């Protein structure tokens, strides 16, 4: 049994990857993959699958779905709210033309590189640097969706490739501000800075290079295979957007700037949550719109 369960996990992971490559609905694939693994843990290994504080129903089959309910409630109030806030902020940035202003300013010089996938790799490296000051993977992903995603689409990268890069930007939790790195340093009996410089960086740098190279070739291969990259970019450019001042391009970047300022790098005495940063900038932009147009 001790060998069977890990092997089952490997098989389910491979099958899930195959199903997603074959373009089966991702949510359904992940749901059933998780249910299979949880059911195996409950019925075959006799593991208590319920989180702390959740009372068992008396039947493991029901507890599987009680686990889903418990996780759903927790995620809806945490990551779920973050996704809704970031989605609303991104939609508002697009509606007022701020996202398009950012794309307009950045795309022209970036296109001179003559390779959208070089820009894609740079976006990945920027995201990985930002994770050192914004250690929340979900928070960083939402901020990059607002600021980086439209730029990558504008230079001709497919939405799938852009999201793949954003999704892996927080793949390595680097730096002394990371909770994982701090825990590892504590267990090892090292200062977090020493742990970061002497132990994390020697492993992280070659890993970053390897992932960046893989992104370049893998995303380019699948974009060419899908043959939808430039068609999508044309649709983005052709979409009618409001005419706004050039300085509106700053607004999508402001939440990231605020998160960097109110971090251990600059002002460590004040902490700013990702959602709070989004709402703060949102309110500021509404006030600017009221002054400029007398309409939000």
What are these regions (language model features)?
Residues 2-17, 30-37, 41, 45-48, ...:
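Long, contiguous bundles of hydrophobic transmembrane helices that form the permeation core
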Residues 127-144, 149, 154-197, 207-216:
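Alpha-helical transmembrane segments and, especially, the helix-loop junctions at the ends
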Residues 53-150, 295-296:
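Membrane-embedded alpha-helical segments and adjacent helix-loop junctions characteristic
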Residues 49-71, 185-195, 264-272:
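Membrane-interface helix termini and inter-helical loops of multi-pass transporters
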Residues 1, 70-85, 197-209:
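Hydrophobic alpha-helical transmembrane segments
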Residues 1-4, 107-115, 167-168, 241-244:
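Short, amphipathic, aromatic/basic-enriched membrane-interface segments that mark the entry/exit
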Residues 19-29, 152-161, 293-295:
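Membrane-helix interface "capping/anchor" motifs
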Residues 29-37, 162-169:
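Central hydrophobic cores of alpha-helical transmembrane segments
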């Amino acid at each position: 049994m001790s060998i069977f369960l890990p092997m089952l996990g490997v098989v389910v992971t491979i099958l899930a990857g195959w199903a997603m490559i074959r373009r089966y609905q991702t949510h359904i694939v992940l749901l059933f993959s998780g249910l299979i693994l949880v059911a195996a843990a409950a019925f075959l290994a006799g593991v208590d699958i319920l989180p702390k504080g959740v009372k068992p129903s008396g039947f493991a089959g029901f507890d599987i779905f009680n686990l889903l309910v418990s996780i759903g409630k927790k995620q809806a109030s945490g990551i779920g709210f973050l996704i809704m806030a970031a989605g609303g902020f991104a939609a508002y940035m697009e509606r007022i033309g701020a996202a398009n202003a950012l794309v307009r300013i950045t795309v022209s010089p970036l296109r001179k590189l003559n390779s959208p996938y070089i820009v894609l790799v740079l976006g990945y490296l920027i995201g990985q640097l930002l994770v050192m000051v914004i250690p929340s993977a979900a928070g960083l992903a939402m901020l990059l969706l607002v600021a980086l995603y439209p730029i990558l689409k504008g230079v001709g990268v497919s939405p799938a490739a852009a999201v793949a890069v954003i999704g892996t930007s927080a793949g390595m939790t680097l730096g002394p501000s990371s909770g994982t790195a701090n825990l590892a340093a504590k267990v090892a009996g090292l200062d977090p800075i020493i742990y970061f410089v002497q132990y994390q960086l020697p492993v992280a740098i070659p890993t970053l290079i390897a992932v960046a190279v893989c992104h370049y070739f893998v995303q380019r291969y699948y974009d060419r295979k899908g043959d939808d990259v430039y068609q999508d970019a044309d649709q983005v450019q052709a979409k009618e957007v409001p005419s706004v001042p050039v300085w509106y391009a700053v607004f999508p970047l402001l939440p990231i700037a605020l998160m960097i300022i109110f971090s251990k790098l600059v002002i460590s005495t004040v902490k700013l949550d990702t959602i709070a940063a989004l709402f703060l900038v949102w309110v500021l932009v509404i006030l600017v719109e009221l002054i400029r147009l007398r309409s939000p």
